[in-house]
């Protein structure tokens, strides 16, 4: 139980520090710099740090701390509730940034800046989290610091099946995100948190259900067991393909690339009035008939 308390304190401290950094950067930086870089970097750091600590609980908790799947899934749900409330509009996910680009909601320079911020934030969180584990504040952190040099791959299936799993998770996530984008935050955040928890339960045993290239790169790309190209296929190509399919299914086309709707018939905005014929038009028709 002491190890769980330490992990809960880690989650709380991470979210609190990131919230302070978020508010400070919002107050000190220009609005454009904050929206396109600082907000994304802090959000990615918060997500990556919590994901790394959650991975310790998932891998070591059941046998070292006696944690059951019900507790772990509850923590996943609560963490994503907190992320959804505190991210201040940041996605912390490269596929969401690419979706905004394909939907003509962001320019190319802005998208590249968001992508670089997400990668840097996730990598910084990985380094800081490992430093925290080195303090050995709990038995789980002690075990994790001893095993850090010998991490195992999160890909526990074939590359093709891993691509399908990550692509399917990303597809359902983005389709839900597109459907809920105009709904209230009080409905959108719990719905997405529940979806992420469900996918963590179903797809976690196969790929850990990242559906986030920046997060996967910071957590598992350096681990032995698979090549960098195999990791890229599963955790980058799979999610990007799933995102594109979700946009196509929702929109019928990719607005950035082409305007022709492939799936849905577009109705005309103007309707021809269907009123009664005037007497003059009736006479004209009668003359034509003669």
Swiss-Prot record:
Keywords carried by this UniProt record: Membrane, Repeat, Transmembrane, Transmembrane helix, Transport
GO cellular component: cytoplasm; membrane
Motif (NPA 1): 93-95
Topology in membrane: Multi-pass membrane protein
Disulphide connectivity of cysteines: none
Localization per Swiss-Prot or TrEMBL: Membrane
Gene3D superfamilies xref list: Glycerol uptake facilitator protein
Stretches that traverse the bilayer: 1-21, 67-87, 112-138, 158-178, 191-211, 228-248
Motif (NPA 2) on chain: 212-214
Tissue specificity: Restricted to pancreatic acinar cells.
Positions of region (Disordered): 271-290
Domain of life per record: Eukaryota
GO terms for MF: channel activity
Any single Pfam family the record assigns to this protein: MIP
Record's function text: Aquaporins facilitate the transport of water and small neutral solutes across cell membranes.
Similarity field: Belongs to the MIP/aquaporin (TC 1.A.8) family. AQP11/AQP12 subfamily.
UniProt note: domains: Aquaporins contain two tandem repeats each containing three membrane-spanning domains and a pore-forming loop with the signature motif Asn-Pro-Ala (NPA).
Name under which the protein is recorded: Aquaporin-12
Taxonomic source organism: Mus musculus
């Amino acid at each position: 139980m002491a190890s769980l308390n330490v992990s809960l304190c880690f989650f709380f401290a991470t979210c609190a520090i990131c919230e302070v950094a978020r508010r400070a950067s919002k107050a000190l930086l220009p609005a454009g710099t904050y929206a396109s870089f600082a907000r994304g970097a802090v959000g990615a750091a918060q997500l990556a740090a919590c994901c790394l600590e959650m991975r310790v609980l998932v891998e070591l908790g059941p046998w070292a701390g006696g944690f059951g799947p019900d507790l772990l899934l509850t923590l996943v749900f609560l963490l994503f509730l907190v992320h959804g409330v505190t991210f201040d509009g940041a996605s912390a996910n490269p596929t969401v940034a690419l979706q905004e680009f394909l939907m003509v909601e962001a320019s190319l320079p802005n998208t590249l800046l968001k992508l670089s911020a997400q990668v840097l934030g996730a990598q910084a969180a990985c380094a800081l989290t490992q430093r925290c584990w080195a303090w050995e504040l709990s038995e789980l952190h002690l075990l994790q610091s001893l095993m850090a040099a010998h991490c195992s791959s999160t890909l526990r299936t074939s590359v093709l099946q891993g691509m399908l799993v990550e692509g399917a998770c990303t597809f359902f996530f983005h389709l839900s995100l597109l459907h809920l984008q105009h709904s209230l935050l009080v409905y959108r955040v719990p719905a997405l948190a529940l979806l992420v928890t469900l996918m963590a339960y179903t797809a976690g045993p196969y790929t850990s259900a990242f559906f986030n290239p920046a997060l996967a790169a910071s957590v598992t790309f350096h681990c032995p067991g698979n090549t960098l190209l195999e990791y890229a296929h599963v955790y980058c190509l799979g999610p990007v393909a799933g995102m594109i399919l979700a946009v196509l299914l929702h929109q019928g086309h990719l607005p950035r690339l082409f305007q022709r709707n492939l799936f849905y018939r577009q109705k005309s905005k103007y309707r021809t009035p269907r009123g009664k014929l005037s007497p003059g038009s009736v006479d004209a028709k009668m003359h034509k008939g003669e």
